């Protein structure tokens, strides 16, 4: 019997099962108070949620989507810097192995690290 290729959503579910979870979803800082006998939409009240008193520190997990995105971009920047260091080491090794020979078909361009890093976005909190 011939096996059909797995459906993309099944494959994604398997991959997500092994993935490290990102930030857990947090409730919105405000919510709409709806009751069974609520008045028309124009009279709905939006009430802010308040944290219990005595909590002055941030929990270890992300507080919201923007914090998760910021942490993700910081990680991507760090990985890009590590990849640049690896490329620089490869380029240096290549020059040491063949001194005086310039290979025009080189797959590693001679770009400086500072030039590439200057094009990375800078984030500040």
Curated annotation (Swiss-Prot):
Cited Pfam families: SSTK-IP
Domain of life according to the entry: Eukaryota
Chaperone found in the keyword field: yes
GO-annotated molecular function: protein-folding chaperone binding
GO cellular component labels: cytoplasm
Disordered: annotated span: 1-22
Record's keyword annotation contains Chaperone: yes
Keywords tagged on the record: Chaperone
Assembly information from the UniProt record: Interacts with HSP70. Associates with HSP90. Interacts with TSSK6; this interaction is direct and recruits TSACC to HSP90.
Family classification: Belongs to the TSACC family.
Function: Co-chaperone that facilitates HSP-mediated activation of TSSK6.
Protein name: TSSK6-activating co-chaperone protein
UniProt organism field: Bos taurus
Species lineage: Eukaryota, Metazoa, Chordata, Craniata, Vertebrata
The encoding gene: TSACC
